[in-house]
UniProtKB/Swiss-Prot annotation, chain A:
The lineage of its organism: Eukaryota, Metazoa, Chordata, Craniata, Vertebrata. Its main location: mitochondrion. It comes from the Eukaryota. This is NADH-ubiquinone oxidoreductase chain 2. It is found in: Mitochondrion inner membrane. GO terms for molecular function: NADH dehydrogenase (ubiquinone) activity. GO terms for biological process: mitochondrial electron transport, NADH to ubiquinone; mitochondrial respiratory chain complex I assembly. It comes from Equus asinus. Core subunit of respiratory chain NADH dehydrogenase (Complex I) which is composed of 45 different subunits. Interacts with TMEM242. The gene is MT-ND2.
Swiss-Prot record, chain B:
Gene3D superfamilies: NADH-ubiquinone/plastoquinone oxidoreductase chain 6, subunit NuoJ. One of its GO terms (molecular function) is NADH dehydrogenase (ubiquinone) activity. The gene is MT-ND6. Keywords: Electron transport, Membrane, Mitochondrion, Mitochondrion inner membrane, NAD, Respiratory chain, Translocase, Transmembrane, Transmembrane helix, Transport, Ubiquinone. It is found in: Mitochondrion inner membrane. Its main location: mitochondrion. PANTHER family: NADH UBIQUINONE OXIDOREDUCTASE SUBUNIT ND6 (PTHR11435), NADH-UBIQUINONE OXIDOREDUCTASE CHAIN 6 (PTHR11435:SF1). This is NADH-ubiquinone oxidoreductase chain 6.
């Protein structure tokens, strides 16, 4: 793509999310979402194969539908409260429709069907932007309307998302689909704690973005999109193999890595609010996630996966430089001792 | 009938939308959009927005739909689909009509749901208001407010339109 056009389009994606996060007028928020959607379509369609076209079309259709639902909720809110500012949404109809619209944008169950298909059809870098940056805007709106969200709907969607994210990822060998299902599960964890303590949602979002960034950077470095090609990294760059191990275990939520911090805090907050069965179920379903991360580490770092002999002697091309990989690795594995610093997120 | 004119016009509006949502060939979709645009203009004018109704006719129908009509005329096929040519299209159209008829009956017969006659103004929430003077029309004041207090909205929408054109050019380039 022409560098000038690419700059303008990336700037508009950034501007769209910033407008959503910084606006106090509901119409500007809707405009920000639409601007974001419009500008990310050519980024998703960077490669001109039919798979990418189909993925971009699916993304556009689902996000446009969600924007329309959001607009309807905004207008119902306007009719009942007479004003356009972002506050607690007092009317229950508007609140429910808004929650459903934002869940569609995030990819929570039962609106999760587009996430694996869209993530699989696009390149790794586009998938990175899709799974990290695009989650910021809807989550910030959910944060702002969190006092008025219907608890039953949100918790149902959250628990089902954790289940679907874990269960659906079990049969996958394509790395982008694995990351998509992992994203669905993490969004479920974030949505579950939103009503009780929104600060933890922001913490989970932060840690999730850092871990997903790290994983995608490692995949881009080894140019691998399937489990099989990931299992050849011991030949290309053995250090990457170790880093994949650490980051995947962190994503699974194992202490003493930083992925444990959000899960621990969320379970603690939920039990403080006297719900015991729910966090138990959530923790058990996170094991499904851990299973397929472990399978990836088993085939990549812990064993030499069976391959043909010519794969065992790889020609060393010039190494790709990856942005910011060392800080990201540190952030996604060693942040657990900094847990008392949670108070800065308030 | 005049008290219900907004209701009748909005029913025709929705029927028009059902007409092109059932996906006949784009030429017929454009035809229905002309009808819907004209009817929408009528709805706006019934609330006192004569300037905005004129804008709909000039810019939307006279600019965008004309360009759309020319491009679809260039890309049309030999036997374009009408609403009655394909069982699926006709089925969807009839289903949409049926839903609309049921909704109209519900609105007219039920006691809870009523027909909107007049929007109440935003009261003292608006920062740019003419009060109850009755001399200036509210919508002209709204347009004026857009270019003074709402300059940021103009910047954002102008930028969105520019990026929209760039995105469309980029997507259709194909390479």
């Amino acid at each position: 793509m022409n560098p000038l056009i690419l700059t303008i389009i990336l700037m508009t994606v950034f501007l769209g999310t910033m407008i959503v996060m910084a606006s106090s007028h509901w119409l500007m928020i809707w405009i920000g979402f639409e601007m974001n959607l419009l500008a990310i379509i050519p980024i998703l369609m960077k490669k001109y194969n039919p798979r990418a076209m189909e993925a971009s079309t699916k993304y556009f259709l689902t996000q446009a539908t969600a924007s329309m639902l959001l607009m309807m909720a905004i207008i119902i809110n306007l009719m009942h409260s007479g004003q356009w500012t972002i506050t607690k949404v007092f009317n229950p109809t508007a609140s429910i429709i808004m929650t459903l619209a934002l869940a569609m944008k995030l990819g929570l169950t039962p609106f999760h069907f587009w996430v694996p298909e869209v993530t699989q059809g696009i390149s790794l870098t586009s998938g990175l932007i899709l799974l990290t940056w695009q989650k910021l805007a809807p989550m910030s709106i959910l944060y702002q309307i969190s006092p008025s969200i219907n608890l039953n709907i949100l918790l149902t969607m959250a628990v089902l998302s954790i289940l679907v994210g874990g269960w659906g990822g079990l049969n996958q060998t394509q790395l982008r689909k694995i990351m998509a299902y992992s994203s669905i599960a993490h969004m479920g964890w974030m949505a579950a704690i939103l009503v009780y303590n929104p600060t933890l949602t922001m913490l989970n979002m932060l840690i999730y973005i850092m871990m997903t960034l790290t994983m995608f950077m490692l995949f881009i470095h080894s140019s691998s999109t399937t489990t099989l090609s990931l299992s050849h990294t011991w030949n290309k760059a053995p250090l990457i193999t170790t880093l994949i191990l650490i980051t995947l275990l962190s994503m699974g939520g194992l202490p003493p890595l930083s992925g444990f911090m959000p899960k621990w805090m969320i379970i603690q907050e939920l039990t403080k609010n006297s719900s015991i069965i729910l966090p138990t179920l959530m923790a058990i379903m996170a094991l499904l996630n851990l299973y397929f991360y472990m399978r990836l580490t088993y085939s990549t770092s812990l064993t030499m996966f069976p391959s043909t002999n010519n794969m065992k002697m790889k020609w060393q091309f010039e190494t790709k430089q990856i942005t910011l990989l060392p800080p990201l690795i540190i952030a996604s594995s060693l942040l657990l001792p900094l847990t008392p610093m949670l108070s800065i997120l308030d | 009938m005049m008290t219900y004119i907004v209701f009748i016009l909005s029913v025709i509006f929705v029927i028009g939308f059902v007409g092109f949502s059932s996906k006949p060939s784009p030429i017929y979709g454009g035809l229905v959009l002309i009808v819907s645009g004209g009817v929408g203009c009528g709805i706006i004018m019934n609330f006192g927005g004569s300037f905005l109704g004129l804008m709909v006719f000039l810019i939307y129908l006279g600019g965008m739909l004309v360009v759309f009509g020319y491009t679809t005329a260039m890309a049309t096929e030999q036997y374009p689909e009408v609403w009655v040519s394909n069982a699926t299209v006709m089925g969807v159209f009839l289903l949409g009509l049926l839903m609309e008829v049921m909704l109209v009956l519900y609105v007219l017969k039920s006691e809870e749901v009523g027909v909107v006659f007049k929007f109440s103004s935003v009261g003292h929430w608006a920062i740019y208001d003419i009060g109850n003077s009755g001399v200036f029309s509210e919508e002209i004041m709204g347009v004026a407010a857009l270019y003074s207090y709402g300059a940021w909205v103009v910047v954002v929408t102008g930028w969105s339109l520019l990026v929209g054109v760039l995105v469309i050019l980029e997507v259709t380039r194909g390479d």
